A protein has these predicted regions:
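Inter-domain helical "communication" segments and dimerization helices
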Residues: 17, 21, 92, 96, ...
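Residue-level detector of anion-binding/catalytic polar loops
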Residues: 32, 181-182
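Helix C-cap/helix->beta junction micro-motif
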Residues: 28-29, 59, 179, 221
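Conserved glycine-rich beta-strand-loop-beta hairpin in the small C-terminal domain of fold type I
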Residues: 110, 127-137, 148-162, 169, ...
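Active-site phosphate-binding strand-loop segment of PLP-dependent enzymes
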Residues: 1-44
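Conserved core segment of the aminotransferase class I/II
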Residues: 57-127
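Conserved PLP-binding active-site segment of the aspartate aminotransferase-like
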Residues: 82, 160-165, 182-217
Length: 222
């Protein structure tokens, strides 16, 4: 199981060379790769990389995708592309599968895609998140300084920020909640806490104030 467009929470992408290694290994050993192509639509800093499914010619790879990042998450429609031999097996047992997505939503989504609206939505969100992620990086640099420890990748809507603080994660989280900040922990080490900061739902105008608030509470001594 791999998510090549989301190797880390801050958007690292699996290079083509590594993808080819996996494809060749699965072909040589008859193994099956499950490819979850989450956030493959949001690649900004390099050209889009071919999927494992495409590189393998549809053999030995199951491709998983979702529309949750492009459309309303409440629609809850995902999809799976199977290699030919598994596709034939699935068709034989399809009546045992419990479909939870309504037919009306599936038909509407199909028409939405046919009419080109999904492609337009993808381009729109890609531009939006590219601008917002750049603004978030700038806000972090402005507030925490040019030497702040930031990790970013070529894709996604998040970055990792390492804070130097005497607080524990539980203490920082409690202070953040008291001040209206919701934080996501990546890792904790003595004197350091690494957080995942997302640009997706917060307005750009709030990036600098939120970073200033985070800096203030992380420097509070208990």
């Amino acid at each position: 199981y791999v998510s090549p467009a989301h190797m880390t929470k801050w958007g690292d992408i699996m290079p083509v060379s590594r993808r080819l290694e996996l494809v060749n290994y699965s072909a040589a050993h008859g193994s099956l790769v499950i490819e979850d192509d989450f956030e493959n639509e949001f690649v900004y800093l390099q050209k889009p990389t071919p999927s494992l499914f495409g590189l393998a010619g549809g053999q030995n790879v199951v491709y998983l995708g979702t529309f949750s990042r492009l459309l309303l998450p409440s629609i809850r429609i995902s999809f799976m592309v199977l290699p030919p031999e598994l596709s034939a097996l699935y068709r034989k047992k399809a009546d045992q599968y419990n479909q939870t997505a309504s037919k009306a939503e599936q038909i509407a989504l199909c028409q939405f895609i046919r009419d080109g609206h999904l492609a337009a939505q993808t381009r729109k969100l890609k531009r939006l998140y590219s601008v917002k992620l750049k603004a978030l990086r700038s806000a972090v640099r402005e507030v925490f300084g040019k030497d702040s420890q930031i990790q970013t990748g070529a894709a996604g809507t998040s970055l990792a920020l390492t804070l130097s603080t005497n607080l524990t994660w539980q203490e920082l989280q409690k202070k953040a909640q008291t001040n209206g900040l919701r934080l996501q922990l990546l890792r904790e080490a003595p004197g350091k806490i690494t957080l995942i900061l997302s640009c997706s739902s917060m307005p750009v105008a709030d990036f600098v104030p939120a970073c200033k608030l985070l800096k203030d509470i992380s420097q509070i001594q208990n």
